[in-house]
Curated annotation (Swiss-Prot):
The keyword Transmembrane helix applies. Contains one covalently linked retinal chromophore. Upon light absorption, the covalently bound 11-cis-retinal is converted to all-trans-retinal. After hydrolysis of the Schiff base and release of the covalently bound all-trans-retinal, active rhodopsin is regenerated by binding of a fresh molecule of 11-cis-retinal. This is Rhodopsin. Residues 378-387 have a biased composition (Low complexity). Keywords: Cell membrane, Cell projection, Chromophore, Disulfide bond, G-protein coupled receptor, Glycoprotein, Lipoprotein, Membrane, Palmitate, Phosphoprotein, Photoreceptor protein, Receptor, Repeat, Retinal protein, Sensory transduction, Transducer, Transmembrane, Transmembrane helix, Vision. The modification N6-(retinylidene)lysine is found at residue 306. Residues 395-431 are annotated as: 6 X 5 AA repeats of G-Y-P-P-Q. Pfam families: 7tm_1, XYPPX. The chain crosses the membrane at residues 35-59, 72-98, 111-132, 153-173, 201-225, 263-284, 295-316. Gene3D superfamilies: Rhodopsin 7-helix transmembrane proteins (1.20.1070.10). Photoreceptor required for image-forming vision at low light intensity. Light-induced isomerization of 11-cis to all-trans retinal triggers a conformational change that activates signaling via G-proteins. Signaling mediates the activation of phospholipase C. Subsequent receptor phosphorylation mediates displacement of the bound G-protein alpha subunit by arrestin and terminates signaling.
């Protein structure tokens, strides 16, 4: 790692209690208005993140219809976002922004960076687990060994915690470092040093902690889209043998599963949009022109990343019918400005047994009907393969049928010499315009009405 500065005099970019990378000394001082704006923004985002994710955890834990294995990932994600808002947002960064420097010392800086890394990796890896669960429910509904249970979800969450800690704890053992960044009011990975140890840490962290979950997410949702296309064809086949009520329930179950998948896709998309600029800055600092990494260019991705913790409660309150119903029951004043779609709620109630059954590890009605349909199709195919048409009765068709020479047409038809040679005669029709025939006497001139002429 590049040695930090040893200047004695304290300036806007140097705090003697922490190690500051000398890269930040190249830029002009940051105006006070920027510090205060960052402090206000982080304070508001932190408070909203704490309250919003607290409501998510409370309602998902309290509401029975939301206590499914898949929603354990949602609770884990909300816990990560709440902790991220409470520790890496408000109040530490807010106070430091108003003080215009990191004031909590070196140990707090390392702890701040460590927890920020753990919670950040935990969020994206939890989203990867959500993608895997959605893929199993929608893309592989009849794979019994892949059904989610509370135990399986708990083990997956434990793995997420361990994986996140592994890729965050390196700087504690001098593999990389945690240092102030941007306008120097928060601490994160040292992405400016280019020594082999730091660069290897940045690359391993980038690919294993960031790119690998993104690849898993992309794979799962690509297969979900393909499965939905096939599912629509299967539903069209099922419509021929189901009555209207059964068909509506099956369609509602599929629609509810797709709604959950769409909510997950929205959450993952906003997370990637929030954290991708930060990843780009880290790679730019390692392999691109370092002078492009200004305090402002480094601070804006930090603000985007820290604001990602407030997106999930907003997405749930807008898109998740069951979550909205739980809010309306427990905190009705939170949705005074919103109205429920009655048809959407009715479809959600019809589909509840479908989604809950599939997520709890049971077999949904939709999956059972699909299995029944496939079994019937296999039975029909087996019957068709085993079917042998009976032999024709003896004496059929009778001998001599069709009569020879009658069908197909007898030889010599049409007769030779037909049409006769020289027909039509040469010079017919004659060349040139047809002869003009004079109008009979008493006829009106060309273009004049006959009745008007006679009158």
């Amino acid at each position: 790692m590049v040695e930090s500065t040893t200047l004695v005099n304290q300036t806007w970019w140097y705090n003697p209690t922490v190690d500051i990378h000398p890269h930040w000394a190249k830029f002009d001082p940051i105006p006070d208005a920027v510090y205060y704006s960052v402090g206000i923004f982080i304070g508001v985002v932190g408070i909203i993140g704490i309250l919003g994710n607290g409501v998510v955890i409370y309602l998902f834990s309290k509401t029975k219809s939301l206590q499914t294995p898949a929603n354990m990932f949602i609770i884990n994600l909300a816990m990560s976002d709440l902790s991220f808002s409470a520790i890496n947002g408000f109040p530490l960064k807010t106070i430091s922004a108003f003080m215009k420097k990191w004031i909590f010392g070196k140990v707090a800086c390392q702890l701040y960076g460590l927890l920020g890394g753990i919670f950040g990796f935990m969020s994206i890896n939890t989203m990867a687990m959500i993608s895997i669960d959605r893929y199993n429910v929608i893309g592989r509904p009849m794979a019994a060994s892949k059904k989610m249970s509370h135990r399986r979800a708990f083990l997956m969450i434990i793995f997420v915690w361990m994986w996140s800690i592994v890729w965050s704890v390196g700087p504690v053992f001098n593999w990389g470092a945690y240092v102030p960044e941007g306008i120097l009011t928060s601490c994160s990975f040292d992405y400016l040093s280019t020594d082999p140890s730091t660069r290897s840490f940045i690359l391993c962290m980038y690919f294993c902690g960031f790119m690998l979950p993104i690849i898993i997410i992309a794979f799962c949702y690509f297969n979900i889209v393909m499965s939905v296309s096939n599912h629509e064809k299967e539903m069209a086949a099922m419509a021929k043998r189901l009555n209207a009520k059964e068909l509506r329930k099956a369609q509602a179950g599929a629609s509810a599963e797709m709604k959950l998948a769409k909510i997950s896709m929205v959450i993952i998309t906003q997370f990637m949009l929030s954290w991708s600029p930060y990843a780009i800055i880290a790679l730019l600092a390692q392999f691109g022109p370092a002078e492009w990494v200004t305090p402002y260019a480094a601070e804006l991705p930090v603000l985007f990343a820290k604001a990602s913790a407030i997106h999930n409660p907003i997405v749930y309150s807008v898109s998740h019918p069951k979550f909205r119903e739980a809010i309306q029951t427990t905190f009705p004043w939170l949705l005074t400005c919103c109205q429920f779609d009655e048809k959407e709620c009715e479809d959600a109630n019809d589909a509840e047994e479908e989604v809950v059954a599939s997520e709890r590890g049971g077999e949904s009605r939709d999956a059972a009907q699909m299995k029944e349909m496939m079994a019937m199709m296999q039975k029909m195919q087996a019957q068709q393969a085993a079917y042998q048409p009976p032999p024709p009765p003896q004496g059929y068709p009778p001998q001599g049928y069709p009569p020879q020479g009658a069908y197909p047409p007898p030889q010599g038809y049409p007769p030779q010499g037909y049409p006769p040679q020289g027909y039509p005669p040469q010079g017919y029709p004659p060349q040139g315009a047809p002869p003009q025939v004079e109008a009979p006497q008493g006829a009106p001139p060309q273009g004049v009405d006959n009745q008007a002429y006679q009158a």
